Each structure stands twice: as C-alpha cells, then as structure tokens.
Design a protein with these regions (language model features):
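Transmembrane helix-loop-helix hairpins at the membrane interface
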Residues: 13-22, 123-247
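N-terminal start-of-chain detector that recognizes signal peptides
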Residues: 33-36, 44-48, 109-114, 165, ...
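Short helix-terminus and kink motifs of transmembrane alpha helices
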Residues: 24, 28-32, 103-108, 151, ...
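Alpha-helical transmembrane spans of integral membrane proteins, capturing the lipid-embedded, hydrophobic core
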Residues: 10-18, 49, 53-57, 61, ...
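N-terminal, membrane-interfacial amphipathic/helix-forming hydrophobic leader that caps
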Residues: 1-82, 227-247
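Alpha-helical transmembrane segments and their lipid-water interface positions
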Residues: 59-60, 103, 107, 149, ...
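Juxtamembrane helix-loop-helix connectors linking adjacent transmembrane helices
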Residues: 39-44, 65-141, 159-164, 234-245
Length: 247
C-alpha cells in the first residue's frame, strides 16, 4: 500500500501499542481488590466500554478509508484458503477448553478462580439479567479490538519491518504484547494467557486473510467467561441491591 505507514499511523500505533498498555499497567499498580459493583453499575460499564471500543475501531477504519486503502487488507473480508488455518482454530479451541476444565476441575481450582475473579475482574456478570449488556461488550471487543490490534497493528508492523528476516513474527508478536499488557489489570497470569491467545489470533488472520474467525473466537472466549462467572461466582450483596443471584 502506498503512503503506509503515514505519520498518522505512527500516532495511532503509539496510542494503542504504548500509551494504553502503560496506562493499564499504571492502573494495575493502584490495585482493585474486592470492589463491588451493583448490577446497574456493571451494565453502565458494559455500555460505556462498548462505546469506547466502537470509537477505537471507528478511528482506525476512518483513517484506513481516508487514505483509500483496501478494506480487505484490514481483514474485513471473507476467510480464504481454509486448509491453511482450520487446524490452528481447532488447536486454539482445544487448548482453551483444556485450560478451562483444568482450572475448574477441583474445589480448590474453583475457589482460586473465583477469588481471582473477585479481585481482578469484579465487573464480570453474576446475574442473567446482566447478560444482554455484557454480550454487547463481548461483541464490541470481538469486533473492534480485533480491527485495531490484529487488522490494523499487524499491518502496521508488517510494513514497518518490511525486509526484516523476522517480519512475520514481529508483526504478530508486538501487537499481541501490547494487547496483553493492556489487560494487565487482570493479573500477570491472565496477561500471559492473553498474549498467547493474541498470537494465535494473529496467525489466524495471516493464514486466513480475514478477521471473521478471529472475531468469532474472541467473542466466544469473552462470552463463555461471563457465563462461567455467573455459574461459579457468588455476588456480594450490597444494601439497595435486592436482585437475587441468577435473576
């Protein structure tokens, strides 16, 4: 593509690769131990988070279109060459299911996982009534985060490191690293898992030429995570929050 990366792309890449991850790491250092959110507060978080993700994606797509770049290069096209990527998707699903089953296969594992949810991600849903707004957030993350961190930043790094012997690896790993650090509030273990998840997604994009499968998998991972918290995490009731668990 001509005129890529432009100085505008450098600014966008700085924001998503450096500024946001550093901000996330700084927020992590403040700690969020055992904060309680009511259902209404969670729904507000999901809606505002969805809007923020939409803005992120809209900025990237707008810049892409302003410079008249092929939208398919951003990954917004149908996946092709099925034989080259289907196995990668299967491996991802198997690894994810294995990790989930192992984490929740014993009482100690469940207790540790629930304790971590309460400490690191207290905004996750604990009632069925919170699911519509939560699924909206999952959809927004699956679509707009993938547009930014896979479709856009992999392209950016690919062109930035053109001619480098490790071009493909760098193009996948750097956005994956930024994406995982941006989730630093979830703890070091989660950051490591998210990094490998993001690497899988990066290679899925490269081999399939499309973000579609990646978006679907991303949505499902987040959605299943919310369903699991509803199943296993008991909400700490606060005065004025009279909704029953699993309402």
């Amino acid at each position: 593509m001509d005129n890529f990366p432009h100085w505008v792309d450098h600014i966008i890449a700085f924001v998503f690769c450096i500024a946001i991850p550093l901000y996330a790491a700084r927020q992590k250092s403040k700690g969020t131990s055992f904060i309680h959110f009511s259902s209404d507060q969670k729904k507000q978080i999901y809606i505002s988070g969805s809007f923020s993700l939409f803005v992120m994606g809209a900025i990237v797509v707008s810049v892409w279109l302003i410079f008249k770049r092929p939208i398919a290069e951003l990954g917004l096209t149908q996946p092709g060459n099925f034989r080259s990527w289907w196995w990668l998707a299967i491996i991802f699903v198997v690894v994810y299911l294995f990790d989930t089953v192992v984490s929740l296969s014993s009482k100690k594992g469940i207790d540790d996982t629930v304790e971590n949810w309460k400490k690191r991600t207290p905004f996750l849903p604990t009632k069925n009534s919170e699911l519509p707004e939560y699924f909206l957030l999952c959809f927004s993350a699956g679509v707009f985060e993938e547009i930014v961190y896979r479709g856009y930043l992999i392209n950016y790094c690919w062109y930035l490191f053109d001619g480098n012997n490790y071009q493909q690896m760098i193009a996948v790993v750097l956005p994956a690293l930024a994406f995982s650090i941006a989730h630093f509030y979830q703890g070091a273990k989660a950051v490591l898992k998210i990094f490998f998840l993001a690497v899988f997604f990066g290679y899925l994009l490269i081999y399939s030429g499309s973000l579609l499968i990646v978006m679907i998998l991303h949505f499902l991972v987040d959605a299943v995570g919310g369903l699991l918290t509803i199943k296993y995490m008991k909400e700490v009731q606060q005065p004025g929050d009279e909704n029953n668990f699993l309402q």
